[in-house]
Amino acid sequence: MPEEYLNAQKMEKLERIKSRGINPYPSTFHPSHTSAQAVALLVEIETQENHLKEVLKLAGRIMTRRDMGKISFMDIRDGSGKMQIFFRQNDLDEASIELLKDLDLGDFIGVEGSLMRTRTGEPSLAATKVSMLSKSLLPLPEKWHGLQDVEKRYRQRYLDLISNADARQTFLTRSRVISVIRAFMNAKGFLEVETPVLQPEAGGALARPFITHHQALNCDFYMRIALELHLKRLIVGGFDRVYEIGRIFRNEGISTRHNPEFTMMESYQAYANYKDVMDFLEEMVSSVVKEISGGYTLPFGDITLDFTPPWPRLTMRDAVKQYAGIDFFDFPTKETLAAEMTRRKLKVDPAKDWGKLVDELVGEFVEPHLVQPTFLTDHPVAMSPLAKQKPEDPRLTERFEAICANMEIANAFSELNDPVEQRARFKEQLEKRSQLRTDESESVDEDFLAALAYGMPPTGGLGVGIDRLVMLFTNHDSIREVILFPALKDREDTKTQE
């Protein structure tokens, strides 16, 4: 960081601290309690006078400061919360009195003292000693307004977390959602595993991959676009229930619902089909909602989402008929469906095949009507190259998407385990991509087909978008609000505090 960005007044104080032989950046300090523990301890023992003089050690960042002659009050914050520190010069040694003069908002300090309440009843620590732990050299965002520039909030998330309690709570909730999901999966007998991020083939989804080069092996690798194919290899290998919570990378557009790097939870269960997985997902999500919120509802914008089981189930064909007035099987080719969409004044991308056009109809006409959690089922084969066909209608697959708040939060199907049919689907998919000249991954994973050829039991697979799920739990309508460091276009003028 160029020195001109540093605050001159803070730099002067830093030099004064150093001149007194104090290291402004010591290597350690051992608090005896967190702020939350100190407040709880005060409540517990404040009627027992003999314990109130117990010496505690707290540490945190100075968030506010009020000086009144020989008395000062500071609020410090650690990871558990806030604690008021009461400084009276008569109670401090000379070194602490001098250090107090050079402390600013944003500095990290360690304090020793005993618990007390002020005349207004505020839990406080009456300090007898203060230690410098880290000198802040840049001013914090203004207290009452925080960080107002939305893009800067994302670029400098550390400042957002310092100044915005809602941002801190969002990521605490995110962590808890993932922990509760993990506990649920473990309790159901699923084995958590880790699969490669760097892969020789980009498979498991229709998406454009990121490509990188391995110098030692002198070959290209893809950043994974899905967890699916390696997890199904583990089902082949004899694990009946597996799951992974991991990062996915897709070299595609950015929006309020899409980030190039995002988190998925995928699970695979032997001897299950998509209806079993539907019941499982319904139980999992409603259980997580109840564990975190205490009930089955969540506020989202100006509506209330109700996750009480069972959720409505609607076939994709019926949904498109109902909301778009189109039976997509009446337009069985890309050309006829594109013509119908053009007639309805919808923009048609010539690079998209029939399945992608159907998906656009769903996004344009169906999803805006699906606010409460709903299962959209029975997708066409053209949209689902890894899913089993429905025996009663081979044009459709045993697949569902869970839609909530007008966006997909999960996708699942009865996994295709016929290696001959899977190879045929892959080849058809590859031919379509070649004709359309798309930038999506264009290779057949021969090792995955070999694994299927050894035999995979009937399997139900599930993918849950963790980021979108967290959006629902935290009442955010942008995925950037729930990802600590979302992808942004580089901009030099925001790399440092202005």
From Swiss-Prot:
Its domain of life reads Bacteria
Which residues are recorded as binding Mg(2+) 2?
Answer: 408
Task: Tell me the cofactors it needs.
Answer: Mg(2+)
Indicate the transmembrane segments per the record: none
Q: Where in the cell is it found?
A: Cytoplasm
Q: Name one GO cellular component term.
A: cytosol
Q: Which residues does the annotation say bind Mg(2+) 1?
A: 401, 408
Q: Keyword set for this entry?
A: Aminoacyl-tRNA synthetase, ATP-binding, Cytoplasm, Ligase, Magnesium, Metal-binding, Nucleotide-binding, Protein biosynthesis
Give the GO molecular function terms: ATP binding; lysine-tRNA ligase activity; magnesium ion binding; tRNA binding
- EC number(s) for this protein? 6.1.1.6
Q: Can you state which reaction this protein catalyses? A: tRNA(Lys) + L-lysine + ATP = L-lysyl-tRNA(Lys) + AMP + diphosphate
The record's annotation in Pfam families points to: tRNA-synt_2, tRNA_anti-codon
Biological processes, Gene Ontology terms: lysyl-tRNA aminoacylation
**Using the chain's own numbering, where are the disulfide bonds?**
none
**PANTHER family on file:** LYSINE--TRNA LIGASE, CHLOROPLASTIC_MITOCHONDRIAL, LYSYL-TRNA SYNTHETASE
Q: Which family does it belong to?
A: Belongs to the class-II aminoacyl-tRNA synthetase family.
**Assembly information from the UniProt record:** Homodimer.
* UniProt name for this protein: Lysine--tRNA ligase
